From Swiss-Prot:
This is Large ribosomal subunit protein bL31. Zn(2+) binds at C16, C18, C37, C40. GO terms for molecular function: metal ion binding; rRNA binding; structural constituent of ribosome. Its cofactor is Zn(2+). Part of the 50S ribosomal subunit.
Amino acid sequence: MKPGIHPEYAEITANCTCGNVIKVNSTVGKDLHLDVCGACHPFYTGTQKVVDTGGRIDKFNKRFGMLGKK
């Protein structure tokens, strides 16, 4: 490999909203904030949970909710 052309590879922490902290190696260089990780994702935990980012479900129901009602 050629010296001096590859990005820096450092250890960063990825913090999830559930409190899980994951240490990974990355070229990003700064810590990450995750909404969902493997410890709290509904597919892996077997529980149903609605993940609503920014009220998108409410916004959709407000716009198109009347179409389904007769």
